Structures are given as structure tokens and as C-alpha cells.
Amino acid sequence: MLHDCFFSAPLTSVNLLNNDIGEAAADIVRAAEQHGKIQTLCGITPDQKEADFSNDWLKAADAVLLAYDIKVNAPLKRLQLNEAALPIHELKTATSVDLSSKSLQNTDAIIIASLMSMVNAPLTTLNLYWNEIGVEGAKAIAAALPR
């Protein structure tokens, strides 16, 4: 049913943040990738350079949707989900990033993991010391590590 929604109309933009979709977020991302024309699952505009969701109480599923937006919206350089802003541009282009003691949470770690798994990501050193990424965030980072 959800799959049919993406393919039946020329939909290019949808905002699914703050819905209790849980693990279905990954299915939505896969459907959007297959569709090929979806530019946002979170309402981020194609020319947007910064996004602040720090007051939106986003969950892990929201971070999965945002990770899709970051991959398809290249101009986005800064994203704030919690206390600290994530340097998206730096995470995409730098070889070393220090994010120690930033009070990062699981949602931040999911975004970081998504950027780590990008094909051309040059990141070789990432410092996440003294944060609050939790088990879910640690699992996302572990899944993004090179095999």
C-alpha cells in the first residue's frame, strides 16, 4: 500500500517526521530510493543549507528518514537534532572529525553512521568520546564500519 503511494503520483516531497513509524522507516527509504524522484522525506528543501530539529523530539525512525534527505540533498551543511549541531559537510568531506563531549544521542549516531556508509566518504578517524549515543546509536555506527 505504501509502495503504491510512491509510484502512483509524481510525488517528490513528503514530510513523515514525528510519526510513530518505527522500523517501517527503512521500508519507506527503500521505496523512495526505488522511486528515484523523492527529494525529501522530512520536508527539507533542495537548496536548504541548515536544519534545526532540536525542539522536535525526533526518534530513531526520524533519523533514518533524515539520513535519506542528507544523501539526496547535497547542499545541507549543518543539522541539529539535539544539543549539538552535526557538521554534515565536514562528515561528508573530512578525513578526521572530533565530536567528543557534544551530548550526541542515538539519533545523531544514526545520521553519522549513514554518512560513514556513503560510497565516497573519506572519513578515517571519528571521535565520539563522552556522548550519549546508547545501544541503538552504537549498533548504527558498528553497522557502518568497513568490513
Regions found by a protein language model. Give the residues of each.
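Leucine-rich tandem repeat or coiled-coil scaffolds
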Residues: 1-147
